[in-house]
Amino acid sequence: MGIFIVLEGIDGAGKSTQAKMLAKWFENRGYEVVLTKEPTDTAFGKLIRRLVLIGGKEGIIDGARISKEAEALLFAADRAEHVKKLIEPSIKAGKVVISDRYFYSSLAYQWARGLDLNWLINLNAFAPRADLVILLDLPVKESINRINGRSIRSEFDKIVELQKKVRKNYLKLAEKFNEIRIINALAPVEDIHNDITALIEHELFEKAED
């Protein structure tokens, strides 16, 4: 069987950068790596990328309003395709799967948007839990500094409030899911990478030998 690792964190935490560095680290050690992300590049994922959120209550896709419940179902549909067509087959083939976001993101973000956590957990019950989830924890102020160039100024206050809720939710999820480990995302990029690989060595390799 393979290894399934997920990188999570609020916007601007450096997930994509660290996922690529981690994939290279495994490849240098002879592993076959599948680097993936959510939302995916499937039809569902492309639809999600056209989603524009308004006021934390509903969203718009191509001019059509959808509820936050429909939004959660759309993310779950994308994830179902991801799991069945890529994640599970790759793990069964003995590969290392590294995902930039997974269902933990849905829990943190959609919980922050007012949906019930248990409802979200049940909705995503089909998705296998990761062997290790690396939560790149970043203060909201630094997150805003990093993503400010990507954002519309008129949405600034909404973004700050959402990121505060999401960070709080991620830290709560770390208490609920024992596969989640917290890494300080304020450190330099190379230091974060070294912290992640040391964690993997300990959690996935050394413990397996005991």
Swiss-Prot record:
Pfam families per record: Thymidylate_kin (PF02223)
Enzyme class at the top of the EC tree: transferase
One of the protein's GO biological processes: dUDP biosynthetic process
Keyword line: ATP-binding, Kinase, Nucleotide biosynthesis, Nucleotide-binding, Transferase
GO molecular function, one term: dTMP kinase activity
Residues the record lists as binding ATP: G9, I10, D11, G12, A13, G14, K15, S16
EC numbers: 2.7.4.9
Any single Gene Ontology cellular-component annotation: cytoplasm
Cysteine-cysteine disulfides: none
Reaction(s) catalysed (UniProt annotation): dTMP + ATP = dTDP + ADP
NCBIfam families in alphabetical order: DTMP_kinase
UniProt family annotation: Belongs to the thymidylate kinase family.
PANTHER family named among the record's database cross-references: THYMIDYLATE KINASE (PTHR10344), UMP-CMP KINASE 2, MITOCHONDRIAL (PTHR10344:SF4)
Protein name: Probable thymidylate kinase
Organism: Thermococcus sibiricus (strain DSM 12597 / MM 739)
Taxonomic classification: Archaea, Methanobacteriati, Methanobacteriota, Thermococci, Thermococcales
Primary gene name: tmk
